From Swiss-Prot:
Pfam families: Capsid_N, Capsid_NCLDV. This is Major capsid protein. The gene is MCP. It is found in: Virion. GO terms for molecular function: structural molecule activity. It comes from Spodoptera frugiperda ascovirus 1a (SfAV-1a). Keywords: Capsid protein, Virion.
Length: 461
């Protein structure tokens, strides 16, 4: 190898396009594999326009409905066919300020983080009074951790309520914006054809939590470490009770041409839909007779009629019911005036079984909180890393199944197998439960003005 030299370069000229093209035209064996034969491929440095029928987006404000727009209430809004396709739903809520009394000098109070997820216990999109899709606050927590990309996560977190804001006795007023993660909001190609569903009544139902379920009262001493949650709040603790000052929903519709309406109404309109199904929570019961806890615990996932695209799950710490989304061993508390989260992992290894065989072997839990979301989701959780996911699909964000499984085809039940961490086994004063949500897929179609669903049974229920 020759020794490099350093010299002044005063004669070099810029290459011309003709000279560069001569280099590009030269081919070796490896170039033929990389670029392919010229007669079969072309590189276009021109923006190609994908033509479509003319349409326009139409936002519509929904304010009227039946029920109670208040804490602990249920409110149902009709979604009239203001357009041809329903693209998305976004909820806007304003909560008034409040004050508490008698909490003690060393106590502080705050709304829970991501308040929009907690305020709405569940939201149901109904067709003729039957739920088509139901989203729980637990699902919205899990979905946002994995499926809101890092570039938008901070903004999204602020929209839905942000983090804790502790005060001595005052509860701040809050405004939250919640983009409701319905399946069709990710891809307009599967927008709900509400204009064609002339024989169906479409509504959206919101179930609100009680105000006492949305606040946490913690101990914050002037010096030293705090003791965590002081007590569960009751309505008697308020001198001024917060209220839902306003609640409204914006529905985005697409309005298309008469030609497209006529053409799509000639034959049944088929489309894919996704439906999250919450698995009933199961408390982890530890032996009390002095025997050793089992090495692994298995939790059966309720069988569904549709395909299974992904699993979201975690072991929630339920020692204090105020924490609706805490999935670690060791509760947070104030220390030297700062709030500390010193929680540790609840699980060391995770596997997934179909019937009695491992579809996914017992792998380190990090595979389900880091590797899986890195490959299949939009974001790897950075703080709430007690949540886990496994995606059977290669890309969870797209609506394409891409590897989703249908347990009905092989008459199989799915089970999540957990090996508890050492800290979980040693946590004798804390209680835990297994939470899971299954993301399932179905085929919908509109025929003769009615929406129907294809699964192993027939119409949607």
């Amino acid at each position: 190898m020759s020794t490099p030299t350093i010299s002044a370069d005063t004669t070099a000229q810029n290459a011309t396009s003709t000279e560069v093209r001569e280099d590009v035209n030269k081919r070796g064996n490896i170039d033929n594999y990389i670029y392919g034969p010229d007669e079969r491929v072309t590189t276009y440095f021109v923006r190609e326009i994908r033509p479509c029928a003319a349409f326009s987006k139409l936002p519509v404000l929904l304010t009227n409905g039946n029920g109670m727009k208040k804490f602990g209430g249920t409110f149902t809004m009709p979604i009239n066919a203001s357009g041809d396709y329903l693209l998305s739903l976004t909820a806007y809520a304003t909560l008034s300020a409040g004050t508490i009394t008698g909490a003690g000098d060393a106590s502080v109070v705050s709304w829970l983080p991501k308040l929009g997820h907690k305020l709405i216990k569940s939201v149901k999109l109904k067709i003729d009074g039957k739920p088509l899709v139901e989203l729980s606050s637990s699902f919205m927590d899990m979905w946002s951790e994995f499926m809101i990309d890092s570039g938008n996560y901070e903004a999204y977190n602020n929209m839905v309520g942000g983090e804790y804001e502790f005060n001595k006795d005052r509860i701040n007023n809050k405004s939250v914006v919640l983009p409701i993660p319905m399946y069709f909001s990710r891809d307009t190609g599967i927008a709900l054809p509400i204009g064609a569903m002339v024989n169906n009544r479409v509504t959206v139902e919101f179930v609100f939590r009680k105000v006492t379920d949305l606040l946490v009262l913690e101990n914050k001493p002037a010096t030293g470490a705090g003791t965590g949650v002081v007590r569960t709040l009751t309505e008697a603790d308020f001198s001024v009770v917060p209220t839902i000052a306003s609640f409204e929903v914006v529905a985005d519709f697409a309005v298309v041409t008469d030609f497209e309406i006529d053409r799509t109404s000639c034959t049944p309109h088929y489309m894919y839909m996704e439906k999250p199904v919450d698995v009933p929570a199961t408390e982890l019961v530890k032996p009390t007779d002095g025997t050793t806890a089992p090495d692994t615990m298995s939790f059966e996932i309720e069988h569904t009629n549709g395909i299974v695209k992904a699993l979201f799950f975690g072991v929630r710490n339920i020692t204090r019911p105020e924490y609706l989304d805490f999935y670690k061993v060791g509760l947070p508390r104030f220390n030297l005036g700062a709030r500390e989260d010193v929680g540790t992992a609840t699980v060391s290894r995770i596997g997934i079984k179909c019937n009695d065989k491992y579809r996914v072997p017992l792998l380190p839990s990090e595979h389900f909180v880091y590797t899986e979301p890195y490959h299949a989701a939009k974001r790897v959780p950075t703080t709430n890393n007690g949540l886990y996911m496994y995606s059977f699909a290669l890309d969870l964000h797209t609506i394409d199944p891409k590897g989703s499984i249908n347990p009905s085809n092989f008459n199989s039940n799915i089970s999540v197998v957990l090996r508890p961490s050492e800290t979980l086994n040693a946590a004798t004063t804390e209680r835990f439960e297994f939470n899971a949500t299954v993301l399932t897929g179905y085929i919908l179609y509109v025929e003769n003005g009615n929406l129907r669903k294809i699964d192993n049974g027939g119409d949607f229920n």
